[in-house]
């Protein structure tokens, strides 16, 4: 394949690993390299990535830096939260949901520039290789895919550093840079590696980059109100912001109050178990609020069906199948359920906790106090329950008369 590749688009962060990949592609494939850097809210200056690419011989016209923050939240994060998606009961899918957008945009740049290949920096052990490559192939089945970690012999940190030094790639460590393997976007930040590879070892407090420790969070709680339209967040405390602005604001609130830390061992799609630590402050608040709104606006059976389908939906995202027909089918069903998910939720934030203290919907609430009051009945006849119970118990009655024991 090496002689067949003339131009490749590399998902490029400007960091050491992808800079080594850039040089390796030039040397091993003798091809033209186009770099693509996505801004999905990782909180880093992206101009250094441009300068780094230029220093490694990339032409100015072959450097693409795109601000995808609003698209990421509007078209990926919000649809996922309409489903209340959680993987294995805990993980809010912060890394998983970012990969489809990066892959799609990278494939589009490949088509735009006439490239015949794409490349990524995901290892051969993880889920990201699957997520990226399923995304590439969904948009351009003819693209060749170069996954250096599955090809090269630079299989240790020492070999990588030696290669970088040999080719004049700066290997100086940024001041304050974490030693952990991290991935960040507007929804979360993740940590892997080092002491975290022992699931019995507690993470150090200074590992957490975003949020206050709940112990150090303010001693006074904070009450906020979130407004929703068709299942999507549209305002915080009455202030309407862009999708990215809303999630940024929620992150600030969550970090301030020590909300959204998570330490889990998850089952990777490739078959192994992996320990990861995550901070998802805004997403944790958003999920709590959305479920509270659905509690008054969704029909019982519709809500229960959503809950049954959610694990499948979450697994599809985790495993990289965002662009699959089955995910789109589920999304259509989920979006239909959100037509009446309109209203306001009041929350109290305090030392790592998100507590729902109110929910209302002017036109779409199915909560009717007249039916569930403990005071004198006016619209509900309690005697009706006797027949309801007897009909539901009929199979037990018949089985009992047949001599069956339970």
UniProtKB/Swiss-Prot annotation:
Binding site for L-aspartate: 123, 127-128
Catalytic activity, as annotated: L-citrulline + L-aspartate + ATP = 2-(N(omega)-L-arginino)succinate + AMP + diphosphate + H(+)
EC number: 6.3.4.5
InterPro entries referenced in this protein's UniProt entry, alphabetically: Arginosuc_syn_C, Arginosuc_syn_N, Arginosuc_synth, Arginosuc_synth_CS, Arginosuc_synth_type_1_subfam, AS_cat/multimer_dom_body, Rossmann-like_a/b/a_fold
Highest taxon above the source species: Bacteria
GO CC annotation: cytoplasm
Main location: cytoplasm
Binding of L-citrulline, residues: 91, 96, 127, 131, 181, 190, 266, 278
Keywords annotated in UniProt: Amino-acid biosynthesis, Arginine biosynthesis, ATP-binding, Cytoplasm, Ligase, Nucleotide-binding
Similarity-based family: Belongs to the argininosuccinate synthase family. Type 1 subfamily.
Name by which UniProt lists this protein: Argininosuccinate synthase
Protein encoded by which gene: argG
